[in-house]
Design a protein with these regions (language model features):
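RNA/tRNA-interacting regions in translation and RNA-turnover enzymes
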Residues: 1-189
């Protein structure tokens, strides 16, 4: 398992090339990476400067499996897979909290966009014992950084009709850029 991402430098270069070709530019690296992975033409995807960090191993036939997640990461790295060099093993809750606080402060200096930190139980046996609920593991939790915010003005409130005929209020906003995405409307609940 792993996560495909688009480094910020590659994102800027890709957008420069797209603009020069008269194509629409991507809003942000995360959306560009997600769209690239879903791209129906693999030749287009192959031309994009995507990268990947591996964070898990399902099963390796004929080999004794590591007992911990941290050992798994070392094993995968020894095979030549790219592992995030910022991974760390925290032995206490306080160490995990300090790790989160450190990266919350440094997130804008990372070569890729990050929206939080994932904390996992290191023991694979304990991970197995805890299991998952649906696709959500009970042995890992994502601590998200505070959301990027923007300020704008409410121009008006309109009403849209939902697919079941319900009337839904919608805020019409002065456009504001938040995380590289221009927001013009917002659902009101």
């Amino acid at each position: 398992r792993g996560e495909v991402y688009l480094p910020k430098a590659g994102f800027h270069k890709l957008n420069e090339e797209r603009a020069a070709e008269g194509l629409p530019v991507f809003a942000n690296p995360r959306n560009a990476a997600a769209g690239s992975v879903r791209q129906l033409d693999p030749r287009i995807t192959a031309k994009r400067p995507l990268d990947i960090y591996i964070y898990g191993l399902g099963w390796a036939e004929g080999r004794t499996m590591p007992e911990t997640h941290s050992e798994t990461m070392k094993y995968l790295q020894s095979l030549g897979f790219r592992i995030n060099p910022r991974n760390a093993l925290a032995k206490t809750i306080e160490e995990a909290e300090a790790y989160y606080a450190n990266w919350e402060e440094k997130r804008n200096g990372l070569p890729y966009e990050a929206d939080g930190v994932v904390v996992k139980i290191d023991s694979l046996a304990l991970q197995e014992e805890l299991g998952s609920v649906g696709s959500e593991p009970r042995w890992a939790i994502a601590y998200k950084f505070p959301a990027v915010q923007g300020t704008t003005r409410l121009k008006e409130i309109s009403v849209s009709v939902g697919r079941t005929g319900t009337l839904n209020p919608v805020a019409i906003l002065e456009p504001v850029s938040v995380g590289g995405v221009t927001i013009r409307n917002a659902a009101l609940h």
